Amino acid sequence: MVAPSKRRPPVMADVAREAGVSHQTVSRVLNDHPNVRPDTRARVEEAITRLGYRRNLAARALVTKRSRMLGVVSFDTTLYGPASTIYGIEQAARTAGYFVSIVSLKTLDVDSVRDAIDYLSEQGVDGVVVVAPRRSAGPALESLPSGTPAVAVEGTLRGDVSVVCIDQAEGARLATRHLLELGHRTVHHVTGPPDWLETEGRLEGWRAALEEAGRPVPEPLPGDWSPHAGYAAGRSLAAMDGVTAVFAANDQMALGVLRALSEEGVKVPDQISVVGFDDIPESAFFSPPLTTVRQDFDQVGRHCIEVLLRQLDAGAGTCERLVVPPGFVVRSSTAAAARVP
């Protein structure tokens, strides 16, 4: 075995000598070129392992004109959805051979988003994913350099930016129809905060399902994604006459609703059925276990990378919209409406 000097890390030429092949053959193996014999590929891979060879990504970037770096702009990563989406993005990017640079924003204003995009652009990222599903993020995306491959989670006002989203309205329809099919006359709704695209989609789907069924549409109760907001809404609902079904716009608010109803002596689901949205891991352990709309955030994150890489391969001017269907998980927090004496 011909070992490289201990004073420097192994380079591609060392791998070629070790495997008894040309520099070009090593390059083809590293780039997963199909025209390499299996036994030759195995020899090269064994040489790479023995020598501890690591690719020089900076040198590769000079040749390919790609940094192998993707940027992510995110808002409120303390929430389950954005955090899970970013995890899916990072895992998919790593599998594809890309690094991820993440900028987390405390406030979602135009200047903050523009500063984040400028910061990522200075790093020479090949593309950008924006995980900030609020209307106020839309104008800031105008600062994206023309031709920069970009994907927005949930939506954007720009026609040249791809979108990956879950069908929020359909998820709300699933929740509302489930309760109507159980015999409930109508369904009360605890909304998410204003400006969020998910809030709009779920409100739209809930209202549409009630109107399509010819049922009365109650005034929605305001929320902010937190259990505290759900608790306040639950106290209000417990004081109302004729409430038998509640659809909360996320599982955290549903948890607050359940707590408030329990404190008021209202039995779930015997007296009031409750449905959430997200299917967070804890929802199966609520009391009672929560019926909820399931969002596959990991799949959303992976689709973001798939769409972004397709844009990189196809060149500027290509964009697409990919919609992920929601699921629905029935547990113990919903039941047939109680008969009115």
Where are these regions (language model features)?
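Flexible loop/turn connectors
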Residues: 240-341
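Alpha-helical recognition/docking segments in bacterial nutrient-uptake
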Residues: 1-10, 69-177, 181
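Glycine-rich phosphate-binding loop signature in dinucleotide/nucleotide-binding domains
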Residues: 51, 122-124, 182-183, 237-243
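Periplasmic-binding protein-like
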Residues: 124-132, 188-191, 220-221, 241-250, ...
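Hinge/beta->alpha junction and helix N-cap segments in small-molecule ligand-binding domains
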Residues: 57, 75-84, 102-111, 164-174, ...
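N-terminal helix-turn-helix DNA-binding module of bacterial transcription factors
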Residues: 1-68, 338-341
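Short beta-strand segments enriched in small/hydrophobic residues
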Residues: 25-28, 62-78, 178, 186-193
